[in-house]
Amino acid sequence: ENDWALKDAQGPRNEDMHYQECVQKQYRALRRKGCNTDIITMEHDLSDYKLLTVPMAYMFYHGYAEKLCTFAENGGTLVISYWSGLVDETDKCYLEGTPNGLMEAAGIRTEEIDALYDWEENHAIPEAGSHLGISNVYTCKNLCELVEVSDAEVLMRYGKDFYAGRPVLTHKAYGKGHVYYVCADMEQAFYEDFYGRT
């Protein structure tokens, strides 16, 4: 349903949002780390999981955000990516801000998204001294989201364009767990390193 809704969305890119690639990059990284990986629906029970990735989940059913918050509060690690929580199950936009229902848990709020041309790219530059210990610079393409940070830790920042210095990866301890927010379509190498450290 999320894929259908994305294909019907009018923007931010008129062609190919690269949703399947976003999911596949994370799946590949997790499998290469030896993690058993399930692809589940929004109705699925989350109690048996320690790590949950929510890649480009444009559509959030009513109540799904609360379920994700509870997962993190109870000790889970939640990884949310850009362009998530924009519409409900009837494809109506949430008006309270995005990612809907997760702004407090993630410690961020989406301001806008930049759709890059196919030949354009930006870079994700690590913050010195972040708890992840990532030191590489990574390429990001296609979609780059701009977020306002309320109380999240910034782990990486954009390297160029009008949003140079803005957050591209954030973290917030939430309850007994953790919430990470990935603001851009990152290259495969990023996910390999990131999931090796979370």
Regions found by a protein language model. Name each.
Residues 1-198:
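Carbohydrate-binding surfaces of carbohydrate-active enzymes
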